Amino acid sequence: MKKLLIFSIITYLLVTINSTADNQNSNENISEDEKILKVGVLLPLSGKFENIGQSLLKSIQLGLFDIDNKNIKIYPKDSKGNALDAYLSAKKFQEMEIEIVIGPIFHESLERLDEISNITFISATNKTQEIPKNTIAFGINLDSQMNTLKKYFDEIKVSKTLLLSPRSDFNYQTESIAKKDILKFYRTYSYDSDPKKITGEIEKITKYRERKKDLERRIKILEKSELDKDKHELKKLEQKHTLGKVNFDSVFVVDFGERLKSVLASFMFSDVSSEKINFFTLNQWFDNTLFGENSLRNLHFPSIDYDNLKKFEKRYFKTYNEKPNEISILAYDALGLIYYCWSNNNFNFKIDQLFNKNGFKGLQGEFIIKDNLSLQKLKIYKVAEKEFIKVY
């Protein structure tokens, strides 16, 4: 197996700094100016998304502190969360001869960045369509999630998976999942986005009323029998809500938040148990509100390395006395990636290094950058009573 290029700042970079001391001595003829690594930071530092932008900026500053190299300089600019201001700030980076920028966050802000030459942008977006040629989509994208789920599906041998998504919402994700054809779905359904109507639609999908009537008919037959075996069966059936199995073995729900909870609760009310049927969804960023509800037990989702995320969040909180935005760890990793490439190329940053075919390992886990996407080797977690358990 080819060795991964590891750049995890906390564990690796400090070693790298020490181990490169000899190289620095042998390159004393290189001027200090040539050793400077200038990194642009393009985030929404004001406006509606200011809190997200400030959280990512603090993560980058935390990474800068951990690297502890005075020759790395960051230059933050405000994208204001829109394409025009992102473009205008990028033009200023161009004037400053900055070649690498962390940001923007949102896909909408990338609109005009392909007009900026000689700069590569590492964006936190998880969308993969219409990415400018000078931009790397560094978010936890569908490709990575589907590839990981495919491997897990093969391992646990599910073959009849339902794909469910709300009408009108998350069209991008649902259409992308279908087009990629990585996962094979037994049937595809869409449901009303109104939580009050979801239960009725799930009942139809699971044929709840038919299964309930089958139970009632069977009970009536058994009630007329005097046979011991029928009486024994009757006692068992009286504890049930339906009779018969559903015609699927797994469900993949493209949803989030309260509506996701409503969908899973509706399956439970329709007498479809998560102990018998596997339930999956997209990356939930370890949302603690998933705890405490029986219908969410054993819900599975792909995500980054949870242990590393908890360590990062603890370190961030200790430094800033506040919780980071969940995607802040990506900004931390982005700086580590840039530093790794720079320090391992005689303090000369080259864009081609980002596309190393052996891949990298950050706090988020292993990944490789290919076709302007960060393809992550994710893990699968399931929701337990008060914890997330890694199952793959």
Predicted segments with their positions:
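Extracytosolic ligand-binding ectodomains
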Residues: 4-392
